[in-house]
A protein has these predicted regions:
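Short secondary-structure boundary segments
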Residues: 34, 114-116, 145-146
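Glycine-rich, Arg-bearing micro-motifs that act as flexible, cationic patches
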Residues: 110-136, 150
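Small/aliphatic-rich secondary-structure junction motif
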Residues: 2-56, 85
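Structural beta-alpha unit
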Residues: 76-111, 149-150
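Short, acidic/small-residue loops that bind anionic groups at enzyme active sites
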Residues: 136-146
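A short acidic, glycine-rich active-site loop
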Residues: 52-69
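Solvent-exposed polar/charged
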Residues: 22, 104-105, 135
Length: 150
């Protein structure tokens, strides 16, 4: 059996990792993954504006911050559970779509996500990775709710 654990390094994601390790058989192969935003093209323009929205330097700096955050998310999740699972950081425009695509490509049997503490307005504006994955995953999804959420 193959499982894919999505993490953003948050307490909910780390709690999901702990729960999964206590529920699954030790022989299950668990891949830990985080998805970071794709690098913004500084030459893109905003509607009605002339010229680039951000400079090349700003785009590079933003990408470095995203990569640092991604590495930290993976490391904090693996360290918290004391696991030596394989981990990977992927770039993509939408984390939910990337996770579902990779689950299909890799023949994953179970996709694990933590439920975030986003309020209804944040979910409305930004969407929810968990909600997308639950509705579009090619395999069963285990959603672990953070103990501190309502």
């Amino acid at each position: 059996m193959k499982a894919l654990l999505a993490t953003d390094g948050s307490p909910g994601a780390i709690e999901a990792a702990h729960k999964v390790l206590s529920l699954l058989h030790p022989d299950v192969k668990i891949d830990v993954m985080t998805v970071i935003p794709e690098t913004e093209n500084p030459m893109d323009t905003a509607g009605g504006m002339e010229g680039p929205v951000i400079t090349v330097e700003e785009a590079d700096q933003a990408h470095l911050i995203d990569e640092r955050h991604g590495r930290l998310a993976l490391r904090s999740t693996l360290d918290a559970v004391g696991a030596s699972e394989t981990s990977e950081m992927i770039e993509g425009p939408d984390a939910g779509r990337v996770l579902c695509r990779l689950a299909a490509e890799r023949g994953v049997d179970l996709l694990i996500v933590g439920a975030s503490d986003k309020g209804w307005f944040q979910r409305l504006v930004h969407g929810s990775v968990m909600e997308y994955v639950v509705h579009h995953s090619p395999c069963p999804v285990l959603v672990v709710r953070h103990a501190g959420s309502d």
